[in-house]
Amino acid sequence: MRQPLLKLAAVTRRFPAGDKDVVVLNNVNLSIGAGEIVAIVGASGSGKSTLMNILGCLDHPSEGTYTVGGRDTHMLDSDELAQLRREHFGFVFQRYHLLPHVDAVANLEMPAIYAGTPRADRHARARELLARLGLADRAHHRPGQLSGGQQQRVSIARALMNGGQVILADEPTGALDTKSGQDVIRILHELNALGHTIVIVTHDKAVARHARRIIEISDGEIVADRPNRHYAEAFAEVGVGAAATTETAADTRSAPASGDAPPPANNDTAADPAPRARRFAAGTGRFAEACRMAWIALVSHRLRTLLTMLGIIIGITSVVSIVAVGEGAKRYMLEEIGSIGTNTISLYPGSDWGDSRADTIQTLVPADVAALAEQPYVDSATPETSRTLLLRYRNVDVHALVSGVGDSYFQTRGMRFALGVPFDDDAVRRQAQVAVIDQNTRRKLFGATRNPVGEAILVDNVPCVVIGVTADKKSAFGSVKSLNVWVPYTTASGRLFGQRYLDSITVRVRDGQPSAAAEKSLEKLMIQRHGRKDFFTYNMDSVVKTVEKTGQSLTLLLSLIAVISLVVGGIGVMNIMLVSVTERTREIGIRMAVGARQSDILQQFLVEAVLVCLLGGTIGIALSFGLGALFSVFVAQWKMVFSAGAIVTAFVCSTLTGVIFGFMPARNASRLDPIDALARD
């Protein structure tokens, strides 16, 4: 004797109601064979819908066992139950349960998506089913554009999408007019004639008489289970004939043979590359569908989506802009430091800044400069000595800082010339009476427009010819107001100051040489020359590192403030997603009923949250570039610098925000009970 396809043994179903449990099904024993057409009849509250939910693996018994093709459903996990619903059951609901925001084809494709059917195959299958059920011209109509009878036919077509070995019809004619109801009953008869097992749940005995077997249920117990003596008459009434059956045959694609049982899940295909490839393709298809449905959901609620993204937009704009401002400021500061001489080491007499004995130390001499310049790690070395002296040109007298320097001083300091040229080594050797002045000195002595090159000025009563004028330097540290004059250090020592020692020596380290190692080497050399350490060094590299570290700290601080905005935006995403889950509870139930796994639902809502954040992140980055363009218009000195790393970080942050703040709503959605979800309005 062939085992029944569906079998309930001593099944009891209880639901908690306050401090007590309400028994909805009590010790139900029922067997349904493959290929039967059965009607379960009962009044409202009799337990017939709960029985159908258990038969369709949407619910589970509190006690007893339910087997499908010999497989005990109690031993199956949620994914295996979803597989049963997806591959062997088809549901026809009284309220149709179609997704309102997609067309008929998309509603039909849903079970096939979760079954991993390729897009082209499932699309062709959906259009074929609609054509067989007389809805070819309604394929791209949404449910709201269809009549009740048409919606129910779409529901039947969806039940057949994956084969539909067992069709569970819950009050299939309850919301239809008489003509549409007869059409639905006729279709169910045709499907049964092709080998589908049909279970009709109804309170209407006129509908029940279309089944070969009628099962009556009352107060959770089966009170009658008898064959229907009027089945032949009912069969003839709806006009089901051989022609109709043949016409529908191609539609169902040979439903499983009446004796076939659902095959057990196969977990031993991991080593076989073909199933692995199919699983990968199916997973990719489900992910693509999740992205498509997420986009449809976002577009369907444009204003809410925009408001949800607003926090992410502000957060990403803040993060990217602050990083760009910080990077631009750092580069500008380093350029400014470079203008006063980067990769340089200066030597001063004494032990440190403010040493009271520094004025009495006279050991820094021109010979030290020559010795340092010969070192392999040194690019150039220049001496420096300075005094404040009186300058005179015609009837104009001013005080200026007069510095005696070497010919490489201007290169070492990164100074540029507006007029004329610097003095050379020959001028230093000859103690030439030549001078280079800055723009402040030019304006004081000659005015802003007159060319001073070739003019003679008195420097503390020593005549000097102006041979060059340095260019103005706009500095982040403020513009320099002092007057500066540079003469050869030999001229300063022999003709102006009357001193043979130097105030300082500046060494420029060769490119590629480590500044710290060079500093140690020159200290060692100078100690050997002087016999003791009567000097200290000042390495500009330490200033650069300090500026970089300060810039990084400031950028980090401001970025943390911006991240707070991003977190607030993420909380907004989570709130809206929780609302979305509540609003779309029935959709979740529909997806679970047609075979969606918990992971599919989790993926659906997680993708939606990530998509919101990615869109917000993209808009935020675009706004940052717009702010950068405006910034360059109003701030001429320096620009915001956008790096690829900052942009990638922004996308990563927006994605992580979607994952982190979208996970809880998505998890809540995946954990919904299918029955509770379907019952929500």
Curated annotation (Swiss-Prot):
List, for all copies, the residue spans of the domain called ABC transporter: 6-244
Which residue ranges does the record annotate as region Disordered? 246-274
Which coarse location class applies to the principal site listed for this UniProt protein?
Answer: membrane
Instruction: State whether keyword Cell inner membrane applies.
Output: yes
- Protein localization: Cell inner membrane
Topology relative to the membrane: Multi-pass membrane protein
Role noted for this protein: Non-canonical ABC transporter that contains transmembrane domains (TMD), which form a pore in the inner membrane, and an ATP-binding domain (NBD), which is responsible for energy generation. Confers resistance against macrolides.
Q: What is this protein called?
A: Macrolide export ATP-binding/permease protein MacB
List the top taxonomic levels of the source: Bacteria, Pseudomonadati, Pseudomonadota, Betaproteobacteria, Burkholderiales
Protein encoded by which gene:
macB
